Amino acid sequence: VLTGINMSSYGVDFKREARKEAIATGDKEDLTGIPDIGDVVIALQGVDGIERIRISSVDPQMITDEFLEKIKGADKLCPHFHLSMQSGCDTVLKRMNRGYSSEEYMDKCNKLRACFDNPSFTTDAIVGFPGETQEEFDETLNFIRQVDFLDMHIFQFSPRNGTPAASMEKQIEPRVKQVRSAILIRAAKEMTEKNLERMVGKKEKVLVEEKV
């Protein structure tokens, strides 16, 4: 399992050092050959004894055409992608400063579906972010159903001292957050059941982690 706080940042430090060296020497900047997380997957693909590779968590901005071109032939890579979402509403995403839109997120999912046979998606969602209206919450509810997640981790927003969100206006009442959380949890369970039902009768290579 490839894991880290920000998987998409792998290789950024290599590129930073290459730029510094180019500036210091006056040479033309050349970033070819500098590895990223896609190169790590390909390297592990060629290691005897490693039969299954999984990426623990993926930032949507990590799913680039270059990354997909590298990993699409990696048959040891488990086609499960935990794509960080937080909200399916663009106005909430903007307040969160997430750096992507719901349309861009869906585009990443569609590109992964084009590269892999029956990939599964899981995600995290926060309900009750400051200022979240009922209409904005409904957008998130509709969006998660469009993506059709296999599973979701759902959290109620809780302010942390010193963060911008903690001092935002229109903090959401605890009861409202509880209700919205329950609605998303129910929707997530329904999606899980439908995803599992689609697998009935199919043969798949699986990894058994514990005795059933």
PLM feature spans:
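Conserved SAM/AdoMet-binding glycine-rich loop
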Residues: 1-134
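Generic alpha-helical structural signal
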Residues: 38, 106, 110, 138, ...
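Glycine-rich, charged/polar anion/phosphate-binding loops
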Residues: 40, 67-70, 138-142, 190-193
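Hydrophobic alpha-helical packing residues
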Residues: 44, 112, 144, 184-191
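Hydrophobic, well-ordered secondary-structure elements that form the walls
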Residues: 83, 124, 144, 152, ...
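C-terminal, non-catalytic macromolecule-binding modules
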Residues: 135-181
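Terminal RNA-binding accessory module
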Residues: 167-212
